[in-house]
Amino acid sequence: MTLPSLPHRRMGAGLAVVLVHGYLGGSSQWDAQVQFLSQHFDVIAVDLAGYGNANHLPAPTEMAAHAQAVLLTLDQLGIDRFHLVGHSMGGMVAQEIVSLAPARVRKLVLYGTGSQGSIPGRFETMARSRERLAEDGVKSTARRISATWLLDNEASPAFESLATLATRASAQAAHAGLIAMEAWDGRARLSAIQQPTLVVWGERDRSYAWPQIEKLWRTIPCASLAVVPACSHALHLERPALFHILLLEFLHLLLHEAATSS
């Protein structure tokens, strides 16, 4: 597959922070984070192939291809080194980016994600998601799954915007994403991640159960853990102010180092 340059949103100046969304997501889900982080950083939020503003692009069935497309896009933007934030499936893409280009990643945030793409303990199995997708179609599936990402389901203030974005995924990408996740396994490479890493998890996450989070935290050598109470899978939408504090606090040391070395 020929790798495309990905649509993206960019704002701010300084050290680069790259935001990678998850399954049925898109760059617009990071709007609040782009606004906040751009006060301190050069922020780039990408749309993975098949999703959001990239729904015209064919989605790969391998995580490594998503990672290569992100790296190609950053190359074209002239960005060499960057902080990396990956959510859900985007966390798998982020782990692939670290594996492909470890020297380019400064700090890593693995948020609501894991190292096992079959996602044991998920609200439903990948096989069942594929069945429901085939039966119900993308739009119905997108709204149904989006509800599981929020503590208050459809009653959450964030639901409509999240679900509307999810319905923009192409049918091909919705299928390809499930295939890519189920086939992916990053457990053997966790101990090789040398970047300072922040693992973030909402304690009521119905997509990624605690054993997945614990595996990241205990296996990545320089990992810290933040567990946010009373939140589900999309805590950056449920508790954005707290999420911003966690990110900025984690990146603060590097800000200080950059200032003192310039």
Please report, for each region that a protein language model flagged, where it lies by residue.
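Alpha/beta-hydrolase fold catalytic core
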Residues: 1-18, 38-42, 75, 79-80, ...
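Conserved HGGG/HGGXW glycine-rich cap/lid loop of the alpha/beta-hydrolase fold
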Residues: 6-56, 73
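Conserved acidic catalytic loop of the alpha/beta-hydrolase fold
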Residues: 65-82
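Flexible "cap/lid" loop of the alpha/beta hydrolase fold
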Residues: 95-100, 105-135
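Conserved alpha/beta-hydrolase catalytic His-Asp/Glu region
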Residues: 118-124, 135-191
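Short beta-strand/loop motif that positions the catalytic acidic residue
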Residues: 193, 199-201
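Acidic catalytic loop of the alpha/beta-hydrolase fold
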Residues: 204-208
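Catalytic histidine-centered segment of alpha/beta-hydrolase-like enzymes
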Residues: 231-240, 244
